[in-house]
Structures are given as structure tokens and as C-alpha cells.
Amino acid sequence: MLGMKLVRLIEKHSEALSRELMEQVLNSEHASDFQKIPQEDLRLAATDLYRNLEEWLLQKREDDIAERFKAVAARRVQEGIRPHHMMWALMLTRDCLWRYLRKEAFLDSIVELHAELELQQLLNQFFDRAIYYAIQGYEEAEEQRRRRTDWTRAQELAVSIGLLSPPRAHHETAEETS
């Protein structure tokens, strides 16, 4: 693939790219929830994505992308990151790549232009799927949270009307259990 030269350029400079991305995310009012997360965690997540970009674009299947971004979304829910902030951060991740490539890649021929367009298509496809599955992950995490809340309310109601006994304390003595 012609665009692999550009992908390798991104992977080679993954540390610098991740620092730039982290600064953009932390300074964006549209992604301000990410200020709740340790900066080192954000930097490592971005570096991992950029460093393994070729694998994500060429070797990973759609199921792999779904699994990864649903898990990321579930983790972000636990961290208090709202969905629209996560989506903005993903868009910043993609945009950071393109700014870098425009700055660093010197297109000397129509072949290199074709390679960049080919890479752009792959990246857009990847990030579209990442956003889709991240949203799905948020929805699944919210549904699980809602079910746990509903179950807790149902148990409390059953106890209050005498259908269930109140839960026992976890620290029972030997006399109480015999």
C-alpha cells in the first residue's frame, strides 16, 4: 500500500503526536471532561493508537475495533466522561494526524498524493467505526447501569412490602450462623 510510508511516519513520531493531541484535548472546552483523567493515562492511550496505526488499519477486523472502542467507552463512562466529549476527542485524534501529515509529508508526485488520499480513506473509515462503537459502548454501559439501579429499587421495594427479608450484614458471628 502506498500510504504505508505515511503510516510509518506517524508511528515513528507517535510520542510527539500524542503530546500534541493531549494538549488539544485538555484545552478544548468540547472535551473538558478529560481533565478528570491523569495526563499520563491520556498520553499512553494516544501513543498506543498512533504507534500501532498500521495494525489498526490493516490487520484488525471490525470486531477488534468494536471490542476496543466499546471497552474504552465503558471505561470513560466510569471515569465520568460524557459521550460528546469522547466523540470530540476521537475527532481531535484524527485531525491531529492530518495536521501532522500536512506539515511533515512532502508530496512530490501524483503517486504520493494518491497514497495520502488512500490513507485518508482508511483513517476516516477507522475513526468512523471507532466513533460508532464508542457510542454503542456508552449505550451498553448506560443500560447496564440502569438495570442495576432498577434491580436495586425492586429489591428495596420487595423488602419494604415484606416480600423479601432485609439483606444480612456481611459480618455475622459464628453464633448467629449456627
Which residues does each predicted region cover?
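Short, low-complexity, intrinsically disordered N-terminal peptides in bacterial proteins
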Residues: M1-L2, T177
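Long, amphipathic alpha-helical coupling/dimerization segments that relay conformational signals between
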Residues: L6, I65-E172, E176
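N-terminal low-complexity or simple alpha-helical regulatory segments
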Residues: L2-H84
